[in-house]
Regions:
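Unusually extended, aromatic-enriched hydrophobic runs near protein termini
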Residues: 6, 105-108
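Mature extracytoplasmic domains of secretory-pathway proteins
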Residues: 42-104
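Short, solvent-exposed loop/hinge segments that bridge or flank secondary-structure elements
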Residues: 31-33
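Sec/Tat signal peptide C-region and signal peptidase I cleavage site
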Residues: 9-13
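Bacterial N-terminal signal peptides
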Residues: 1-5
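C-terminal partner/receptor-binding element of secreted or periplasmic proteins
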Residues: 15-29, 38, 108-154
């Protein structure tokens, strides 16, 4: 019975840590410090190895830290190379673990860096970004043919 109590306490503490991390970073423009967080930086270095410099070059021009569900993300592009040299880092903050993934678009190909070995197990954060870069960001600015916009009748 004591171990169940300890586990429940641990989960509550982890959930509080999760909420604190999300509250601290969501919407922040201090992306350099976010990317240098020990759990983020260490995992990126393990996943990317010699490609770490390429990732950082492709994140040179970036916005703030985005939040979707439990995932914090930073994406950007190399200077003057949007749609050609881009990257993303996705950090999914779960109660018992934090999952770090990254992807680089370079020379028309997307390379995913993750512990998961199958694409279907990648986060929605990565998959949505891949869909966006594969469209050349067109779907952000031009209405797709199968999308209708409806407004209330006055």
């Amino acid at each position: 019975m004591a171990s169940v109590f300890v586990s429940a306490t641990s989960v509550r503490a982890d959930q509080a840590t999760q909420r604190a991390m999300i509250a601290k970073w969501a919407g922040s423009y201090d992306t350099d410090t976010f990317l240098r967080q020990p759990m983020v930086r260490a995992e990126l270095q393990k996943l990317l190895g010699s490609e770490m410099r390429h990732l950082m070059d492709n994140l040179n021009v970036r916005g703030g830290v985005d939040l979707s569900g439990e995932t914090l993300s930073v994406n950007g592009n190399a200077p003057h190379q949007g749609t050609e040299e881009e990257a993303i880092v996705c950090v999914t903050v779960l109660p018992l673990k934090t999952i770090v993934e990254a992807a680089i678009l370079s020379k028309g190909a997307v390379t995913v860096f993750a512990r998961e070995e199958k694409y279907e197990n990648a986060s929605i954060c990565l998959k949505d970004w891949i869909t966006l870069v594969n469209s050349g960001h067109a779907d952000r600015f031009t209405q797709p043919a199968n999308v209708r916009v409806s407004s209330p009748v006055p």
